[in-house]
Amino acid sequence: MPIGVPKVPFRNPGEEDAVWVDVYNRLYRERLLFLGQEVDSEISNQLIGLMVYLSIENDTKDLYLFINSPGGWVIPGVAIYDTMQFVQPDVHTICMGLAASMGSFLLAGGEITKRLAFPHARVMIHQPASSFYEAQTGEFILEAEELLKLRESLTRVYVQRTGKPLWVVSEDMERDVFMSATEAQAHGIVDLVAVK
């Protein structure tokens, strides 16, 4: 039996009575953002809108992006990454559960020294994939060229954000590489592993 999104009380400053808001809206007011699903255009636009709004509201107070995602679409994910780099406040990234594929890319995109993984979190990197089987031959070639450009772009970002040599990142992206939190720290995707 689904219970929906839980509601919590929230009192606006200067108001006597609290109103009930869903838990995510309450957490957004504290600058805590959540990516708890596959990356697609809808969640990308929501997170971008929240980051821009909160940045305008207060450009000195940090944002916190909690990630538990199996990955998803590259272009919407890169849009989130670019926004993280663009907004004035530092964006902390926190991996809880899984940050795979585009999720790990966003995890690495947090402010350097402010990227964290919970102790039992898992991180996975790999190269971008496509649905070639649905394309005609001409489209297949164009899509392959675009995919190679995307792979090169993602690889360059991983190199910049992790400090690893290009050949190491390129080799790791050839296949699915799963890491524990401490392995992700050694790889430069996160800076800290949370402890009690």
UniProtKB/Swiss-Prot annotation:
GO terms for cellular component: chloroplast stroma; endopeptidase Clp complex. It catalyses: Hydrolysis of proteins to small peptides in the presence of ATP and magnesium. alpha-casein is the usual test substrate. In the absence of ATP, only oligopeptides shorter than five residues are hydrolyzed (such as succinyl-Leu-Tyr-|-NHMec, and Leu-Tyr-Leu-|-Tyr-Trp, in which cleavage of the -Tyr-|-Leu- and -Tyr-|-Trp bonds also occurs). It is an enzyme of class 3 (hydrolase). This is ATP-dependent Clp protease proteolytic subunit. It comes from the Eukaryota. Keywords: Chloroplast, Hydrolase, Plastid, Protease, Serine protease. Pfam families: CLP_protease. InterPro entries: ClpP (IPR001907), ClpP/crotonase-like_dom_sf (IPR029045), ClpP/TepA (IPR023562), ClpP_His_AS (IPR033135), ClpP_Ser_AS (IPR018215). One of its GO terms (biological process) is protein quality control for misfolded or incompletely synthesized proteins. Component of the chloroplastic Clp protease core complex. CDD domains: S14_ClpP_2 (cd07017). Signal peptide: none annotated. Cleaves peptides in various proteins in a process that requires ATP hydrolysis. Has a chymotrypsin-like activity. Plays a major role in the degradation of misfolded proteins. Its EC number is 3.4.21.92. The active site is at S101, H126. It is found in: Plastid, Chloroplast stroma. Belongs to the peptidase S14 family. GO terms for molecular function: ATP-dependent peptidase activity; ATPase binding; serine-type endopeptidase activity.
